[in-house]
């Protein structure tokens, strides 16, 4: 990588660290209409857009999220702060996960913590995740700069400087992409494991399983009686 490419990476990292995010305290405590929701999201996440005309959130997106059971429906056409939290989760997750995987993650979250008496409250969950992600963001420059240094050690025997610069840039993109690919696989495996365990626990027990549980309970009761007698 030439000096210009290195400077670009440095500038990009500084920009990423300073990007706007939806802080827990930024979310309004009043309910919003759909137009107000899209405006709010666009104002707070505009720095993340790749292109100027990219849309952070549209009415169609919100309606589709509701139809696909990612987002609970509004109440009298108004969206609460809990809706904003869920929409923010969707915004980040949709860049790496399928709609079905996001649904598997968000459904348990919204069922238990969306406008319920569940503990912790959804705003507490959002705040804790936000605080952890801030720490991850602080560690990002060191990780990317490390991969940048590795890419600069590649293709050193290429004499043409323009070709060398491209190949080293390609190396950096591959290193970063491999990192994302591996983490995406880990995420999908975690979701699959959770889904399988939940399906197993939700499945009605067979007569044999019920009998086995009763037998084990009787054995445990006998063991408890023996232990009590021995103490006497």
Residue map of PLM features:
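Extended hydrophobic/Leu-rich segments
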Residues: 1-3, 8-16, 155-159, 166, ...
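Basic helix-turn-helix/winged-helix DNA-binding cores
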Residues: 2-112
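Intrinsically disordered, low-complexity, charge-dense segments enriched in Lys/Arg
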Residues: 108, 112-223, 227-232
